[in-house]
A protein has these predicted regions:
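Extracytoplasmic/periplasmic substrate-recognition and gating elements
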Residues: 61, 66, 160, 249, ...
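Glycine-centered hinge/linker elements that transmit conformational signals in sensory
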Residues: 177-178, 223-257
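Hinge/lid segment of periplasmic solute-binding proteins
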Residues: 37, 101-151, 204, 208, ...
Length: 439
């Protein structure tokens, strides 16, 4: 078996990631949803999530061992999925399984999407709301629900004289962060990890953080999409970004070169209290060889000074919808449908997605996730706190995100102004939406 990574997070490596078996194996008898071994096709999955590459390789290898069906998993570099997908789909041996981020992504790829209406995997969904539709056709299946917020080192926070209960609003967060900065040399740590703006990290701010002003504008206007964002809460976006970059492990001018690995390693080394990231980071922080246990960490909402902050939850949703390439051969389509059904219905698949990938999956056979951050989200929801919806799937294009990211980077470096960020956000949105409408 050949296992590898096309390009990992922040990497420029280029090698095939494949899981194949030399001979056909019998299907396991241990589960009623065991995979079949007589499929004639093959599976090529273009994976979106670098942090789960190893787990997908292992699961693909297990499926191949069990069924004899070749499964190739290729993982795009962080921030390069759309570019990689365009390149791979132009090849004769194109992915049989790929993903889109929601309605905007689907608009670009719907002509390649097999109608999953009535498929076995669609029948496993716990709610039809996780089916991505175009008219009556189901063209995508949401396969993971995730949360993001401020991952917090409770031990460091307590060393600074505070607890999680002291932070219930942006004003509270600002007070704590600025106090930590004032005593940074004495304490030996910063408030925030570096807000890296290179391609392996900038999505945290041009997409995930940018979701907050979009969400609150949509809430205020009673909408769920727009061709003309107004930027009502961009002052709040500025406030939280300023807090990040002025109370972190490095000078703001250094952020253009800071990576996702830099930010994670700073947190792992207890150099900062807060780390904006998501539930997908759990296995990078807790477990064998990692410095933290569940008792050391939690996740807090990203407060920006808008709305009922005392009852605000984590940012929870999905931008991960599986699509099956309808241009693939019938055998490959059937093999791909069998594979994804096995992933979400078999003991092996659901356990791997819960334990190894840290996923909460919206399927009937889902295993309970041991992920601390998933549990925190569940607890907040049970307490009546309102999750912040993932509205960034309505962002008009990747080009829009890149424009906002470039403006944020220049602003942090002191070579650009916040007005440039506003222009990229508001005018850029209108321009990209107009291009979409004309396409």
């Amino acid at each position: 078996m050949a296992l590898g990574l096309l390009a990992g997070c922040g990497s420029s490596a280029s090698s095939t990631a494949a899981s194949t078996a030399d001979s056909t194996a019998s299907a396991a008898d241990s589960t009623s949803t065991a995979a079949t071994s007589d499929a004639a096709g093959k599976v090529y999955y273009l994976n979106f999530k670098p942090e789960q590459d190893e787990a997908w390789q292992d699961l693909a290898a297990k499926y191949t061992e069990e069924t004899g069906v070749p499964v190739t998993v290729v993982t795009a570099a962080s921030g390069q999925y759309e570019t990689t997908l365009m390149s791979e789909m132009a090849k004769s041996d194109a992915p049989t399984l790929f993903q889109v981020n929601g309605p905007v992504g689907l608009a670009s790829w719907k002509d390649y999407c097999y109608d999953l209406s009535g498929s076995k995997i669609a029948g496993e969904l716990t709610s039809d709301s996780y089916a991505l539709k175009d008219g009556d056709a189901t063209l995508g299946i949401g396969y993971v629900i995730e949360s993001y917020g401020l991952i917090t080192n409770k031990t460091l926070l307590e060393k600074a004289g505070y607890s999680v209960d002291d932070i219930k609003s942006f004003a509270d967060l600002k007070k704590v962060a600025e106090d930590i900065t004032a005593r940074k040399d004495e304490l030996g740590f910063a408030a925030f990890t570096s807000a890296g703006m290179d391609g392996s990290s900038d999505w945290r701010f041009k997409t995930h953080l940018a979701n907050l002003p979009i969400y609150f504008e949509y809430q205020a206007d009673g909408i769920n999409n727009t061709d003309a964002i107004k930027g009502t809460y961009l002052d709040n976006y500025k406030d939280i970004f300023d807090l990040y970059i002025n109370n972190s492990t490095c000078d703001p001018a250094e952020l253009a070169g800071k990576t996702g690995d830099d930010s994670r390693n700073e947190f792992l080394n207890s150099e900062a209290v807060f780390f904006q990231n998501g539930s997908w980071e759990y296995n990078n922080l807790v477990g064998d060889g990692k410095p933290f246990t569940d008792d050391d960490l939690t996740m807090m909402p990203i407060y920006v000074g808008v709305g009922d902050e005392a009852n605000q939850g984590l940012c929870t949703g999905t931008e991960n919808y599986w699509c099956v390439n309808k241009e693939a051969s019938e055998d490959d389509i059937n093999a791909t449908l069998d594979f994804i059904y096995w992933c979400v219905s078999s003991d092996e698949g659901t356990k791997a997605m819960a334990d190894d990938m840290g996923f909460v999956i919206p399927f009937k056979a889902a295993a309970e996730s041991p992920n601390l951050f998933v549990k925190v989200d569940n607890e907040m929801t049970a307490e009546g706190k309102t999750p912040v919806a993932w509205n960034f799937s309505t962002m008009p294009s990747e080009n829009w995100k890149n424009g906002v990211g470039s403006a944020l980077t220049a602003y942090a470096a002191g070579t650009g102004s916040w007005d440039d960020v506003v222009t990229a956000f508001v005018d850029g949105w209108a321009s990209e939406a107009a291009l979409n409408a004309a396409a």
